[in-house]
């Protein structure tokens, strides 16, 4: 089977290529060097000959510091319109299936109960809105194209960026963190497990899925795991959640504090699939990459 992967040189795409090849798929890797900007006019068709399945990873990523004048328009241009263009080209080229990597942010920022395929969509920022609108476009094409949608929670692994690498750096520097009394629950998915889940999605029943490690953690316990992999002590102290929220607001770190203290879990139900890698092993691999990268820096 021929599988085309967009965003093939990215964080997830690099890992996915190897996993697909290991499973015996013929992989066609596509990056922006081949297709240019991703929007409603992208020329996908020349790359789709004899392709059976597309895994669509390419997109405009969520960022902590947005610089665009109209962020929603920019996200829509790439994530919604670019996906719609790809899907239409896929149908015209005879592609059988499209696997779309969306985000749990489509469901919101917190959850009282694990998100699943019946949970309502509540996107709250331009990135999540654009991902949800892309999903809606794909849903409208289900009669012409098999659609598999993944909404992963936070993804971590070697080469990770964003909040996870920031957390590793804080623990590595020995900075005391006021999270000892936080009892939240967060779902995560390691890079190895996500790549394996996407491989499962290439042949699974079309639908909406929420992959995870199936080992939900509190922020405090996640920090302890990172500290253990760094051979450091987890420097945690208690602070009342309300006081912590106020401190985060005053420091301009409200979004980070909300992510560390709020709960967000998913059901992780992919029929017939189990995570091949433990969270402890993936965290150790991530921390080893971090320490190797730090030592390699001038």
Predicted stretch roles:
Residues 191, 220, 224, 246-285:
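Conserved C-terminal active-site "lid" loop/helix of NAD(P)H-dependent oxidoreductases
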